[in-house]
Structure formats: C-alpha cells, structure tokens
Amino acid sequence: MARTLPSQYDPFDAEPRWQRFWEEHRFFSPAADGPGKPFSLVLPPPNVTGSLHMGHALCFTLPDVVVRYRRMKGFKTLWLPGTDHASIAVHTVLEKQLRQEGKTRFDLGREAFLERAWAWKERSQDTIRGQLRRLGLSLDWTRESFTLDEKRNRAVVKVFVDLHRKGLIYRGKYLVNWCPASQTAVSDLEVDDKEEKGHLWQLRYPVADSDEFLVVATTRPETMLGDTGVAVHPEDPRYKHLIGREAELPILGRRIVIVGDEAVDREFGTGAVKVTPAHDPNDFEIGKRHGLPMINLLNPNGTYNENAGPYAGLDRFVVRKQVVARAAAEGWLVGIEDHVHNVPYSERGGVPIEPYLSDQWFLDVSGMATRVLEAFDSQNQPAFVPERWGKVYRDWLVRIRPWNISRQLWWGHRIPAWFVAGSEGEYVVAHDEAEAFAVARERYGPDVQLQRDQDVLDTWFSSSLWPFTTLGWPDQTEDLGVFYPNALMSTGFDIIFFWVARMAMMAGEFTGQIPFETVYINGLVRDEKGQKMSKTKGNGIDPIEMMDKYGTDALRYTLVREVTGAGQDVRFDYNRKTGESGAVDASKRFANKIWNASRFVLMNLDELTPAALGAADPGSLTLEDRWILGRLGQTARQIDELLGRYALGEAARSLYEFIWDDFCDWYVELAKPRLEALETRRGAQQVLAAVLDRTLRLLHPWMPHLSEEIWQLLHQPLEVASICVQPFPTGTDLPAEPPAEFALMQQIVRTIRNLRAFAQVPPLRTLPAVRLASRNAEERAAIDATRQAIAHLGRVEQLPLEEVADEHLKQVAVGVAGTVQVMLPLGGLVDVAALAGKLRRSLEKLDKESGVLAARLDNASYLANAPAELVTESRAKLAEQRAQAAILAEQLARLEN
C-alpha cells in the first residue's frame, strides 16, 4: 500500500473505522494482572432518557484526554462505562407518553409499566452507547454496567440491609418535598426556587368566646384548611394574653389553639402566623414543639382529600381561588398585597412542590459524613481540581441532614422491606422474600402474611455505590483489588453533593477508603451569549450535529481548547441562523493543516518509515533542525507537565501553537528546498519523520482518530499496533531550548511580510530586494547564517546587509526586527502616489462611518431604547473602526514622509 494520504481528510470514514479497530483489539481493556501502575475512573453514568447534550460532550471529552494521556504514559488505564436508570426522569418521559394515550401508570399497572420502562431503557441505552463511541471515548465496553442491572441490585440490597441492621436506615413520618406531577418525594437538591409575583392574603381568625380576632398573613390561603394552631411570640404584648386560648377556623369551624413560640418574628406582618404542621416545614417544627395535630390535606396527585371538607377532590390551585372568594364574600379576608417570593419547583416535574407529611425511609449519614470530613481535613482526600470546589464539598458535609432515600415510583431498586399484614406498620428487612418470610415467621408466627414495600430507592442511592460496584463489589474480585480506589473522578460542580459526597460516604462505610484520589470539576457549556443551556430556554446545541458537520476530533479539540482553566465554563461559538460554529470550523481547519503537512512529509519520505530512515546525525543538524527539535522538546515538556496537573485547555493551546506556527509555517517551509537537493534530502527526511511522529503522539489525546490515521500510514507496514499505546513524548531527550539566532530570522521574515502587506504587494510576488542593517556584529553573523532561509520565506531575491543604513534612500518602507533595520524599496515596485491615494480614501471612508456610529452612541434616546446587545455590538464596532483608522493614518504618514 502506498504511504500517501488522500488530498483531503475524511473524518466520517476514519472515525468509526478506528473506533472499531481499538475495541476489536481491546486496547481499552486492561488485564488486572497486566503491566503498569493502575489508573482507573468511572464514567458519570448518563441517564437512560434520550440523547447526550453538549454538556456531556465536554464532561466526557475532558477525562478522555486524561485517560489517553495516562495510557500512553504506561499506566494500566481502565475507564468504566455505564448508564443510570434515572427513576424520576424515566417516569417523567413514560408518564408523558401515557397521558398522550389518555392513561396513567396506575391504569397500566406496575408490571406493564415496568415492561415499558425496560423497553425504553434498551432503546435509549443503545443510543447512548452509539453517541459515547461517536465521541471517541476510550471506554472498556467489556466491563459495562447499568445502575439497575442484577449485579448492582445485589449490591444495593446488601447495602440497604446492612445499614438497616446498623440502625442507620429507619422509617418515619416526616415532611417531604412532594412533586404532584411525578407523585413522589424529591430531595432538597432536586428543588429549584423560582422568583414569582404572587400575593400575600391577610385572613381574620376570631378568638373563641370573645370579640377579639387575630389577623394572619399567608401566601397559600388554601392550606388554612389544615391549620391546627396560630402562633405568636411569647413576649409580644399584643397577643401575650391570648396564649393558651383558642381561635375559630373559618369554613370548617374547627377550634385551634393559640401558642407562644419564639420562632415567630413579631416584626413581620401582623406578628401572628397560621400553623399548618402537615404542609410547611417551619410549621412542622412548631407543631412538634407544641404537640399540635398534623392534618394532611393532600392526595398524591395534588388534589385535596376528605380533610378539606367541601373542597375534597379539587386541585390545590382551584381550592386557593375558592377559599379566597369565600373569604371575601364572608368578610374574613382583610386585605391582599402584591408579594414577590420564591416558589419551590420540582426540577423534573416542573410544578410547584408541596410540603407533604408522609411515611418515608431515611438514612442517617451523620457518622459517615464525619469520617469523610476527617479524611478531607487531615489528608486532603480527595483532592479537588480546581481546589476551590473542596470548600463546597466540605460545606455540604458539615450541613448534612438525614437523607430521604425512598421514592413513590415503580422504576428503580425496590426497597427490600416487607410489611406485616394487619399490623401497625411492622416490617422486616431482608435480602429476598424467602429470607423475609423466614424472619417474619420466627418473629410473628407461621401464619404471618407479608406485603412488599411498593416504593423504590432514590436513584442516587445506587449511584453512590458506583465506584466500587462497577468493579464487582460485594464480591472481592481481581478488578476491585487492582483498580480500586479510582485515581480520578471527573464530573460537574452541580452534583458535588448529589453524587461526589455520597460516593465518598458510602465508600468509606463499605470499603474503608475514599473512592477516588482526585476530583476534577468541569464547568458548564454556555451558549453563544454566555447563557446556561437548557431545554426550557431552547438554546441547546446538539453535539451530534456538530460532529456530523465538522467531525468528532474537531468538536473534541474545540471543547478542550476553550477551557481557560480547570472548572471554568466554556462559551460555545454558534450561529443559530446557519447552524455553524466558527470555533469548531477553526478546529477543522487545524485538522486539515495537520493533514496537509503530514501529506507533504509522507510524499517526501521515499516510502521509508521513521525506523528505516534512522535518527539524524546530531553533527549534521542544520539550524532549523536544531530549532524545531528544541521547540518540540519545549512543547513536549510543557504539555506533559500541564496534563499531569489537569491544565487540559492550556496544553491544547500550546500544542496548537507548535503545530500551526512552528512545524507547519516555519519548519516544513524551510525543509522544502532541502528535500529537492540530493545531499540534504536524507537529513530533512529524518527530522521531518521524527518530529511528525512525536507531534502525532502529542496530538493523540485530543484528536485520536486523525492522529491514528496518519500515524498508521507513517509507520507502515505494521502488525497490530496503535498510537494509543505508544509512549507519550516527554521531551527529556531533546534540546533544552531552541537556538536564539533562529528567533532573529523569524523576526526579520515577519517584518518583511508586514512591509509587503503595507505596500500591498501580493504574497506570492517575489520582492527584488530587501535591505538589512545592524550595528551588532552577532546579529550580522546570525543574518549571514540564515540569509538563505530569510530569502526563501520572505520571497526576496537580494538581501544586502550593511552595518549602517543608507540615510539617502527614497521611497522606502522601514521596519525593525530587534535592532535590525529592515528596508523595502518601493520605487518600481508599487505606484507610491496611487498607494497613498488609496490609503487616504480608505481612511476618509472609515472616518465617515465611525463618525455616524459615534453620533448614534452619543444619542441618549438611542441608548435608552435600543436593545442592550445592539448597543454593545455598536460600541465594539466603533472601537474596531477607530483602531483600523489609526493603523491607516500611521501607514499614510510613513508613506508621505
């Protein structure tokens, strides 16, 4: 096979081909007893609810760069894939489908609903697998897990039973966040507060057996049907005499006690508050302190129950309207005020949360949190990158509360508890039904009847076991012994407590170790305006569309390059009108630049591999050889150091600069004349091949498919081998720094190019002469040594060099490179007068346009009425026009003088 590249790189052919190659040859599947120090991590399991979004693309590409780097550094690298069963999210999707069919899950029944859920999971999981492969992730698919599969279920049941036996899991009636849409409890972290314009209603409650009354203020008048008390501050002189007496509840006529409680703010509102213990967290605490009855008004679907009297069966918001209307009609509505307040919404269900008194399972994590805090404070385990997120982690652990682990759903790990029929809530916890009956018969007699708990565990319960259950726990597997604890956990800041802290607590409890050494926190991908992407805003960008348009490597490189620092957000450049991204297009052009340079090298290697060419003789290296090897060494050492401390974006930008500027624009161009001469051809070939090989290896973590495609052709013929397991260049065997004289040559060439642009001489036109002058003998010697390179790169025929510039030269454009004067004679090269006229006209046009724009921006009416974005754009445009005008004015002055 000829070792040449097609004229253009086709990512859509190369990417799936190399992904299959890597998996077929198990490059990502390390043997537990294989060589190398282990480096392991788990993929944050995406929910089986559809497709990946741009946030996933960033979150997964960043650790893949690290994984590929560590693999090339000789580590026994294992990256474990998997998916999350996502109880609430799957219920939301499937119940929406059922509503479109005019049904509910209760119409369908548990078994039929679960059949649908498993079918959905299979389809969604296949989609996600395909997308993860499409991203080029180096995951070990032979070790894939699912949070609800049989192995994980066995682990979850064991953990639940063990924690219950330790007294850490218990059952109780508590106020929970209830989502009427999903009909389940949700954690505090799954609640979003939204600021809304509402009302504050003032209601009059008569004091029993007197002419007095109390006025209470509320944002939820419908809950007055569940009031069991009115609270006042015990030292409030307005109400102190009423403490211990009763008030009459309108509508229902129930008598409720007036209590004194120091939690009441006597300065807020009227200083008297209605107490609804079953539907408000603060009232719940007041109710407990004073032994008030707790009356639940709510059905699971958000309608009111029989405790609401005439409003039973009505939706909560309908009840609100009817209660307010009745209060107004009967005269106990004192007033209504506009009121802006935060309303808690269910993150998944998208509806206002209801505080709801319910029997739930809880996990006391206080002891676990204490041990995890000790490890963090005394040993910095785990270490956070960036370090500031460690404070967030610590704050969550300090402020921890009992974890409500039960959910009133069907899809998930069913709670391994069985209730004793006919008892007052008696139950047994066991690994399976047979064990449950054995325990129950011993405890309650041979005729005992059991009913399995209908609830499932919070999805985060099984996810919190992910680092060790994916390696086989509770079995003591070889993988668990070798790859646990994980070296790295890469995830988003928004789930530091949801997931990271809980994994640490569970791992500490069941393995005695913190489950990961380092936690890398990535930022968000924001849209082109800097806004957070969300389904609600409709401003998401599909990573698959970007990969379809530009290729996977271009998207990967863009996402990582744009990370200015660990944990920083990425603003994604995107034109919604055209569906194009300038940033990803730039990365595609970068890939094409690499392809074209590699194609040139391969075309000039005479079918020889780097091994066949051999290493270049150090004594025969030219200045440009020594320079490119020095720059390669600098770059390799820098990238190795940056990747070692997770500065992934900075490393990507360093590599871009080396490849685009140093290798392609300078060295390849300088190698061209040497390749044409027989006596210099082999030396140029040797250095080109060696530099290309190492450059491809440096590139591999970011652009795995492109680098593999070129590397395979560079090294043909090969047995089964891959760039992904080649040594990562560290640069320790290369020069410490490039020769300084090369930098002077670069400055001179850049100055010649700038003068050419100023004189508007076409880039490909050869300049008859450029005059150089320097009083510095070392500079003149360096120029002499690089004169041929300067002439070649600057496209100059003659390069006279003088110690002192001729002051009598006319019509010369002058520039400076270091202390070297660079003079471009313009006579005969361009029409100086015409050039001056052209510059003058351009300057006049620019001054006119900027004047119009400046006047607009000085107009107060425009600034007050124009969209803020347009004003910002106009100011930026004016600044750009003024900068261009300054450059034109300087050029014109130089030309006229």
From Swiss-Prot:
CDD domains, per the entry: Anticodon_Ia_Val, ValRS_core
Binding site for ATP: 535
MF (Gene Ontology): aminoacyl-tRNA deacylase activity; ATP binding; valine-tRNA ligase activity
Coiled-coil regions listed: 839-897
Motif annotated as 'KMSKS' region, chain positions: 532-536
'HIGH' region (motif): residue ranges: 46-56
Record function comment: Catalyzes the attachment of valine to tRNA(Val). As ValRS can inadvertently accommodate and process structurally similar amino acids such as threonine, to avoid such errors, it has a 'posttransfer' editing activity that hydrolyzes mischarged Thr-tRNA(Val) in a tRNA-dependent manner.
Protein name: Valine--tRNA ligase
Gene name tied to this protein: valS
